[in-house]
Amino acid sequence: MLKLRILSVGKTKEKWLEDAFNEYQKRLKANLQIECLWAKDSYQLLEWTQKESLIICLDPTGRLLTSEAFATFFSKCWEQGGSRLTIVIGGAEGLPLELKQHSILISLSLLTFTHQITRLILIEQIYRATEILKNSQYHK
């Protein structure tokens, strides 16, 4: 089974966001084992990623992708990274330069979101990507 780690700063405080995140996590459960870790700060994210081979960081300077391009990108990352993939969401101060230099940078939008909203958008796009790759009706 494919394993996805989502690392981010701070926990989700709003129940409705957590419920929505959990719904997508439940939908993905058949294909993906998702582990979420909440860091105190961005430097803890750096510590947690020291031994990771393939890291994707969400960053405003990263490459913007359509949902279809994200699905293709996501699929290629699995091929490159094996059965484990790590996606990192920084806090308000952004990500440490050292982490950004050793990662693939993508952006979900030109807009700025809280890290809590970003987690929800990210997991929905991951779900959408899996559905695009299966050619399901979800994306149509």
UniProtKB/Swiss-Prot annotation:
Coiled-coil ranges from the UniProt annotation: none
Pfam families, alphabetized: SPOUT_MTase
Localization in the cell: Cytoplasm
UniProt cross-references to InterPro entries, sorted A to Z: Alpha/beta_knot_MTases, RlmH-like, tRNA_m1G_MTases_N
GO terms for cellular component: cytoplasm
CDD domains: RlmH-like (cd18081)
Binding-site residues for S-adenosyl-L-methionine, renumbered to this chain: L58, G90, L108, S109, L110, L111, T112, F113
Assembly notes: Homodimer.
Function: Specifically methylates the pseudouridine at position 1915 (m3Psi1915) in 23S rRNA.
The protein's name: Ribosomal RNA large subunit methyltransferase H
Taxon lineage: Bacteria, Pseudomonadati, Chlamydiota, Chlamydiia, Parachlamydiales
